[in-house]
Amino acid sequence: MRKKDDVLEIGVLNLMHDKEDTKRRFERVLTREDCRVNLTWFYPVMHYQDREVPENVRQMSQPLDLNKVKELDAFIVTGAPLEKLDFDDVTYISELQELFDCLSTEGIEQLYVCWGAMVAANYFYGVDKYLLNQKLFGVYSQVILENYPLLEGLSDGFLAPHARYAELSCSQVREVPE
């Protein structure tokens, strides 16, 4: 990542259905006075391959372009309400996989949120997701196991909202060598 006095260029692939609200929430967290950040918002092109891109999506984001991604310092892939689908049934899965390869090859810092984390864990490490018997919904304590610059200012733990129908296999996550 860049030095503190430089602007940090972060790309965000916004996969959520409530794009405006998701954008507002990420901007509130990532654009602080003590950290100069420029956010570039993207949408998956393949998601709109058979239909027109909605006006609100066009106004707030641009088509995912790996050449533009290569110029960024970091990249975030948001969640999406797709956890009930098999990964291969997602219309833009190959586009995501190309993005994952690009980010890794270019050495770009990555953050995956919710379903974005599930699909990345599956792609990079073969970790499976499984459906829960009922939706997990609520605010739960999180523990920080390792310090990282992105987590500066947080205590040893924090509360985070959860709303999902699937989880990753904990035993497979524990087997990941990294």
Regions found by a protein language model. Give the residues of each.
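Beta-sheet entry/capping signal
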Residues: 9, 74, 108-110, 158-160
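A structural signal for short, well-ordered beta-strand segments and their strand-loop junctions
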Residues: 40-41, 110-114, 162
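Cysteine-nucleophile active-site neighborhood
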Residues: 77-145
